UniProtKB/Swiss-Prot annotation:
Reactions catalysed, as given in the entry: (R)-mandelonitrile + UDP-alpha-D-glucose = (R)-prunasin + UDP + H(+)
Family: Belongs to the UDP-glycosyltransferase family.
Taxon lineage: Eukaryota, Viridiplantae, Streptophyta, Embryophyta, Tracheophyta
Protein name: (R)-mandelonitrile beta-glucosyltransferase
Nucleotide-binding recorded as keyword: no
Species for this entry: Prunus dulcis
PANTHER family: GLUCOSYL/GLUCURONOSYL TRANSFERASES, UDP-GLYCOSYLTRANSFERASE 85A1-RELATED
Residues that coordinate or bind UDP-alpha-D-glucose: T146, Q363, H378, W381, N382, S383, E386, E402, Q403
Length: 483
C-alpha cells in the first residue's frame, strides 16, 4: 500500500451506520486510509460516542493529530437506549434528521485550522443522506456497503420482489406454510436461492413496513454514489459482484479488510490502538485458549444484535454441555429479549472444567487462535469473513437482515457451514456440534474454509484483486474530483 504523495493531505470523512457490525469494518478502512496518508474524521452518533467512552475509557477516542472523532445527533431522545435497539426507528430517524447536522460539521471542518479541507466522504451504504452533502459540497462520495455482495444483491432486488407481489406477504400464515420455500430463479448472479434466503425484511404483511421501504430507497439512492466498496473478494463472490456492477456505480471489492489492516507496521501502533467497541472486551479468553488443544474449542457468539428467548438460551446451553466439547461462549448484555441472560447453574457446574463464558471478546484474535475448531454464529458478514480468515467452519443460526443470505451461501456455495434449520433443541445442537468438530462433514468444511483462507490472503497480497481494488478506489475516486 503506497502512501499518498501530496503537499496537503486529502481529508476523508467517514460516516458509519450506528451499529457495532457497521462501525468495525468502517474503522478498519479509515485506519488503512490514514496509514496511506489521508487525514481522517470519523463521525459517530453522540449516543455511540458516549457508549464507546464508557466501554473503553475516557481517553479512548482522543484520536491522533491526523485521525479525529466527531459526532452528530441521531435524532432520538438522548438517553433512550431502547430506541437505539429499535432498528426501524434508528433508520427512520437518521435518514430524516442527520443531514443538517452533518452538513454543519463539514462546514466546521472546512474552516478549521487543525485539518485540511474535506476532499471526500466514505459513508455506510445505509446512510445515504450523506450523498446530498457530497453533492452540496462538490466532493466525491464512496458508499461502503458492509454486507456481503450476495446480501446487497438481495436488497437491490427488493423492489422487484414487491413488483412481483412476493412481498409484503398476503397472510401471516405465509411465515410457516412453506411459502418461504418459493424458488427465486430470476436474480442475476444468484442461483439456488429461495424467498427465505432473501434478507429478512421481506418477512412482513405490512405494506408500509419501514425496513422494506427503507432498503428499497437506500439501494436506489446508492446509484448517486461515485463508487461502491464491498468488504469481500473476487474469488468468493465474483458472479454476484459482476451482476451488481451492471446495476450500480463502479464496485470495488477490497476485502477481507482485516488482512491488509493486520499488515500495518508496528510503528503505527497508536493508530491500531484506536478502538470501536460498544462493550468492554474480555482478553482473558485468549489466555484460556492457549491452554487448549488445536481445533478443539467451539466458539459461540451471536453478534451484537441477535436476541433469543431464555428457553433457546437453555437449549443452546445443554446442547453445548452434552457435546462434551470445550467451548468459549460470548453472552453479551441484551442477548435474551427483555431480561438478563441466565444460564442454568447445573450447566455451569457440568461444564466448569471445559467451558468459558464472557460478555464480549476480541473476535478476530479468537478466530485466528489455533484452539478454535468451529464457530456457532449468527452469520453476520463480519463474523463470516473473520471465520474465513481463520479457516474456521460454521454452525449457522441467522437472526435477521442479510444473515439469511450469508447462511445460504456459506452452506451451499462456499461449503463452510451447516445451518440450524428449525427449532433450537439440545439434542439437535449437540449433534451439530459433534458433526462440526468430529464428523466427516465437519472435516470437509474445515478443509474448504482453509482453502478460502488462502484465497483471501492471495486477494489482499500485493497485486491481488482486493489490493489493486483498494489502490484503484483511492486513486480513481477518492483522490479525483467529483464527476
Amino acid at each position: 500500500m503506497s502512501p499518498v504523495a501530496s503537499k496537503e493531505k486529502p481529508h476523508a470523512v467517514f460516516v458509519p451506520f450506528p451499529a457495532q457490525g457497521h462501525i468495525n469494518p468502517m474503522l478498519q478502512l479509515a485506519k488503512l486510509l490514514n496509514y496511506k496518508g489521508f487525514h481522517i474524521t470519523f463521525v459517530n452518533t453522540e449516543f455511540n460516542h458516549k457508549r464507546m467512552l464508557e466501554s473503553q475509557g475516557s481517553h479512548a477516542l482522543d484520536g491522533l493529530p491526523s485521525f479525529r472523532f466527531e459526532t452528530i445527533p441521531d435524532g432520538l431522545p438522548p438517553a433512550d437506549a431502547d430506541a437505539r435497539r429499535n432498528l426501524p426507528l434508528v433508520c427512520d430517524s437518521t435518514s430524516k434528521t442527520c443531514l443538517a447536522p452533518f452538513e454543519a460539521l463539514l462546514t466546521k471542518l472546512n474552516s478549521s485550522p487543525d485539518s485540511p479541507p474535506v476532499t471526500c466522504i466514505v459513508a455506510d451504504g445505509v446512510t445515504s443522506f450523506t450523498l446530498d452533502a457530497a453533492e452540496h459540497f462538490g466532493i466525491p462520495e464512496v458508499l461502503f456497503w458492509t454486507t456481503s455482495a450476495c446480501g446487497l444483491m438481495g436488497y437491490v432486488q427488493y423492489y422487484r420482489l414487491i413488483e412481483k407481489g412476493l412481498t409484503p406477504f398476503k397472510d401471516a400464515k405465509d411465515f410457516a406454510n412453506g411459502y418461504l420455500d418459493t424458488e427465486i430463479d430470476w436474480i442475476p448472479g444468484m442461483k439456488d436461492v429461495r424467498l427465505k434466503d432473501m434478507p429478512s425484511f421481506i418477512r412482513t404483511t405490512d405494506p408500509n413496513d419501514i425496513m422494506l421501504h427503507y432498503m428499497v430507497s437506500e439501494t436506489e439512492r446508492s446509484k448517486k454514489a461515485s463508487a461502491i466498496i464491498l468488504n469481500t473478494f473476487d474469488a468468493l463472490e465474483q458472479e454476484v459482484v459482476d451482476a451488481l456492477s451492471t446495476l450500480l456505480p463502479p464496485i470495488y471489492s477490497i476485502g477481507p479488510l482485516q488482512l491488509p489492516y493486520s499488515e500495518i507496521p508496528s510503528e503505527y501502533n497508536d493508530l491500531k490502538a484506536i478502538g470501536s467497541n460498544l462493550w468492554a472486551e474480555n482478553t482473558e479468553c485468549l489466555n484460556w485458549l492457549d491452554t487448549k488443544e488445536p481445533n478443539s474449542v467451539v466458539y459461540v457468539n451471536f453478534g451484537s444484535t441477535t436476541v433469543m428467548t431464555n428457553e433457546q438460551l437453555v437449549e443452546f446451553s445443554w446442547g453445548l454441555a452434552n457435546s462434551k466439547k470445550p467451548f468459549l461462549w460470548i453472552i453479551r448484555p441484551g442477548l435474551v429479549a427483555g431480561e438478563t441472560a441466565v444460564v442454568p447453574p447445573e450447566f455451569l457446574e457440568e461444564t466448569k472444567e471445559r467451558g468459558m463464558l464472557a460478555s464480549w471478546c476480541p473476535q478476530e484474535q479468537v478466530l485466528l487462535h489455533s484452539a478454535i475448531g468451529g464457530f456457532l454464529t449468527h452469520s453476520g458478514w463480519n463474523s463470516t469473513l473473520e471465520a474465513l480468515c481463520g479457516g474456521v467452519p460454521l454452525i449457522c443460526w441467522p437472526f435477521f437482515a442479510e444473515q439469511q443470505t450469508n447462511v445460504r451461501y456459506s452452506c451451499t456455495q462456499w461449503g463452510i457451514g451447516i445451518e440450524i434449520d428449525g427449532e433450537v433443541k439440545r439434542d439437535y445442537i449437540d449433534g451439530l456440534v459433534r458433526t462440526l468438530m468430529d464428523g466427516e462433514e465437519g472435516k470437509k468444511m474445515r478443509k474448504k474454509a482453509l482453502e478460502w483462507k488462502m484465497l483471501a490472503e492471495d486477494a489482499t497480497a500485493p497485486k491481488g484483486s482486493s489490493y489493486l481494488a483498494l489502490e484503484n478506489v483511492v486513486s480513481k475516486v477518492l483522490l479525483s474530483p467529483r464527476d
